[in-house]
Amino acid sequence: MMRLWTTLWMCAACLTAVLMPVGTLQAESRPSILLLLADDLSYDAVHALGNQEVRTSNIDSLFAQGTTFTHCYNMGGWNGAICVASRTMLNTGRALWKAPQTKPQLEAEFAGKRFWSQSLKAAGYRTLMTGKWHLQIDPAKVFDEVRHVRQGMPHDSDQYNRPLDGQPDKWSPSDPKFGGYWTGGKHWSEVTADDAIAFLDESVGKTAPFFLYTAFNAPHDPRQSPTEFVAEYPADRVRVPDNFLPDDPHREAMGLIDLRDENLAPHPRTPHAVQVHRSEYYAIITHLDAQIGRILETLDRTGLRQNTVIIFTADHGLAVGQHGLMGKQNQFDHSVRVPFLICGPGITAGRKIDSPIYLQDAMPTTLQLAGAAIPPDVDFQSLLPLLHGEKPTTRQAISGGYIDFQRMATAEGYKLILYPKTKTARLYHLTDDPLEQHDLLESAAVNEENRAMSRRLFRTLLDLQRENGDNLNLTSVYPELAPE
């Protein structure tokens, strides 16, 4: 009889645990959350995602252990510093044209306890931020603790307009005299990893879960790394991208004239200059990968790995010589599409999901995992339904924009890019043309099928504009695409 009662009691306890609302879960049962955020890392700059030139063995191990979202995007930017908009959206959950852009607006968000870290803290999480912040509010206000907060980018004026063909290049990515990432005596990526490792060691034995916001400046320029990493990528062995151009013919219409990022390499672009920049890009990515490896080793050593959800992503991508561009202020996939990986307890290993998402979906996803309240005005979506194998019910398309110079919508394997200043429209079939080399609206390619797809994507873009608070009037600029 005693055995029967014991069995019934255990069954009742298990049923109670299953039916318990997420918000009432005990701290010990909720996962800790580790965000690994890169800067300027395109989806096509990771070995596990198809780039055979770059070595990213530690990042690759994460992709093998978790679920990859293959079509993850950033929504765009309201000025040249795309990272500011991306990180503001990430930390507030607001869409691009609704997000707080000014210090008073961000202070109001803080007062309303709407920041990502504040929501997790309210749910009992310990929060720490290290590395790049780039929001116009002191991160010490919104995290329990901050360490080595960095500015938007390491400053180094010697990196611009180089290399010049036929002339010696006086700049060296591994020489500390040029400052940048070397300012302070130790490479910033190593310092950020040191901070994360120290926090993890301090977390051993503590019952409250943590939210560790680890934001690397790398691989943002100046792309500096130690000599041994630079030596892995001799410039003359680095492949020139298949979509290389000396210049993009629409650069002025895109709002890119005299933009800082576009002055990193000489105009017109040369294969040699692009090889040099891409070699330095790969070197700092591999150095970043080594720092991520140190953090992962610490998770394993401390035993924290078994109850930690890891998200690896980037604030946006980067052109680095593709389409004649160097920066990220454009709507091509190399600049708006980023890697996105989530792994940890309960997450399927080795799975790939091709449903379109925004990187800022990380916020509501982790809040739901933590049993924390999701603010009602969050515009992004939890990925848990997709992770649980449910089919998407709402988002079928992605939109993007840059100031009032560019707009984009992608759906059904196609992408429509608009440059309203010159009434330019470009259409790409991403399934057949992933490098976006063949504009289907050019006179030689245009046909009724392509025109119909343009009109369909234009209607989708108008719908997403309304949803995301984008007030740019496109209908008057493109009456031929507008619905009747």
Residue positions per predicted region:
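C-terminal "closing" transmembrane helix and its immediate cytosolic amphipathic cap
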Residues: 466-471
